[in-house]
Amino acid sequence: MKPFQKDKIKILAFDIDGTLFSSENIILDTYIESIQKFIKSSGRELLIPSKEKIIKQVGLPVKQIFRNLLPELNEEERDSISDNVLVLLCEKIYEKKGTLYSGVEDCIKELFDRKYILCIASNGRAGYINAILDSYKLLSYFKELVVIDYSSIQSKGDILKSYLTKFNMTGENALMIGDRKSDWEAANYGGSPFAFCEYGHAEPKEIDSFSLKLTAIHDLLAFL
């Protein structure tokens, strides 16, 4: 893992789920509602995944989530459920359901004032990310959003590298901030240091190396 060098950091690349926001208290009902809607409209018999199985998928690319949860369906069928999940999640986020972690708003504003380039590097879709940032009035602090398009951008690592290219910087100039293995992998792929959010959704022993460890998002302010 790349060592953290404070004076080299220009870009802060944030994951969303388990880093800035937790959808844990709305994910289960939303997924179940969407799967039940599909069952009713299609007449298919499906075993609804358990809460534990659903929560374990948080932070993975969307298509991978639904392949893991509903392998018996084809991609078009999974996408129809996934699209309904997105609509319902965005509605709930704008109703201020879900949880923005304590200190996020002040931390983001302070880092913006310190002239860091703030970016999002998430496996989530644009609508979901924008709903979170917009509903908490944080959207204006972040640069243009890059998301997985399953073409030129296929992973979180590709997202991070696209920001490095866009701002003409190298890996050591970006700090990847997140809670899951995909965030660790993105940092490693981009040659960047990794700030591990231990308060997020990581499984025990999922993250075994990091450049920094955060017990809360505002810990970043002390490191930077």
Annotate each language-model stretch with its function.
Residues 7-102:
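N-terminal helical cap/lid subdomain that shapes the substrate entry/recognition surface
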Residues 11, 156-184:
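Conserved Lys-Pro-Asp/Glu-containing loop-to-beta segment of HAD-superfamily phosphomonoesterases
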Residues 50, 77, 140-144, 171-175:
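Short acidic capping loops at alpha-helix termini that bridge into adjacent secondary structure
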Residues 5-7, 113-116, 167-172:
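Glycine-rich phosphate-binding loop signature in dinucleotide/nucleotide-binding domains
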Residues 91-120, 130, 157:
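Short, acidic loop-to-helix structural element flanking the phosphoryl-transfer center
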Residues 175-213:
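Acidic, Mg2+-coordinating phosphoryl-transfer loop and its flanking beta/alpha structural elements
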Residues 122-124:
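Conserved phosphate-coupling serine/threonine residues in phosphotransfer and NTP-handling enzymes
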Residues 54, 139-154:
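A short, structured active-site edge motif that brings together acidic residues
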